[in-house]
């Protein structure tokens, strides 16, 4: 019976046109869904503001906030540490003011709030400053938005956070530089991400031959198309998994028949036969 009552209330709200009545329902009704529906029906900015300021329920505040247009009020909410972080972040998303976002990015005490502000900034010089921030998550968000190749290379070399190095690599296009990262990175995932962006065959061969990481060798080999080189690996490499990778890219059917007959490892036989 109670569920029917709540369902009826929610249906009733859909027919209410009085903004004041919708406000009262939003603030005081017993059923949470009915309250949310009432907020969705409110169109007057003054009423939405009152609902936002007078409700203690975070979800209801967020629903009202989605419809609030006043930049002044949104900025006040974004700056107020007394509000939940998700409310402040929602306010930041609705603000259209680069200089205001910079203030938040520089001075706010909440890491997630700073990151949200940084994610909306387009000023490359400012983003470069934040890419040197003491807080890794702020650096991470900033580096994703930077296009300066030389700056990204420097961060890839100097930052000590693998996630940030990885993000820098994603926007670097210098193949020789990526090879150096692939061969010299201490973190295997970072080295792998560099290989993932390399297309030049001579660089992939060098990485395969010189990398200390198995996954990096595997990735490089999987991108090599030179048939003569692949045949050498298929015959001479001591690791059966790498021989399989090489064989899977070889097109010479007679060669594959020979490997199926002569290789001592069962998985290599199967790869040579079935690809």
Residue positions per predicted region:
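Alpha-helical scaffold segments
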Residues: 1-275
